[in-house]
């Protein structure tokens, strides 16, 4: 017989699913910034970050560690805390300026010098929203950075929570479409021999 756990009634059940990030405002810390090309061939900055404070502190590091520990997964785990900023195309300047301004306002004595390496270890505020996607034939939800703000605005709760980004109904209908059986029996006359 095993020993009874003293605070058994207060223990929270852990089903191995881990904490799920929810929509809201978070204080984030930049771990690295890399200049890359998008799938469309456009220049972009990839901001690798993690959550720096609160209930979800180190959220992406924990996910990465857990994925690394999974010996049954042959795929190399990917860092999930990423924010993409295009450096060309329509309207990219405003989004880049919003991000840089958020970083400058969140880090005293920091001034952007056009060197992406200078962003490392800096804080910024991020507003995450829920986004739907399809995985293995089912609609799932994930949270991603929608916009950036200063750390102060996040701490003061001075932002609006965005609506969930839902998939178009026609995309959802494709995965819920009934299976149509197009099987036609083959007779001996249909055989090539």
Which residues does each predicted region cover?
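Short beta-rich binding modules
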Residues: 1-193
């Amino acid at each position: 017989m095993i020993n009874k756990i003293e605070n058994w009634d207060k223990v929270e059940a852990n089903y191995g699913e881990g904490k799920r990030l929810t929509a809201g405002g978070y204080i984030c810390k930049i771990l690295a910034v890399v200049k890359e090309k998008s799938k469309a061939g456009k220049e972009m900055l990839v901001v690798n970050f993690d959550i720096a404070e609160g209930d979800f502190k180190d959220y992406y590091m924990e996910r990465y560690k857990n994925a690394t520990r999974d010996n049954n997964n042959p795929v190399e785990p990917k860092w999930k805390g990423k924010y993409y900023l295009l450096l060309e195309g329509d309207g990219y300047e405003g989004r880049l300026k919003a991000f840089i301004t958020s970083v400058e306002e969140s880090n005293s004595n920091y001034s952007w010098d056009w060197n992406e390496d200078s962003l490392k270890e800096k804080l910024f505020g991020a507003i995450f929203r829920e986004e739907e996607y399809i995985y293995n034939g089912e609609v799932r939800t994930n949270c991603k950075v929608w916009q950036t703000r200063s750390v102060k605005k996040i701490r003061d709760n001075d932002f609006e929570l965005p609506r969930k980004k839902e998939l178009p109904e026609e995309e959802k209908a494709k995965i819920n479409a009934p299976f149509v059986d197009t099987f036609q029996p083959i007779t001996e006359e249909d055989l090539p021999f």
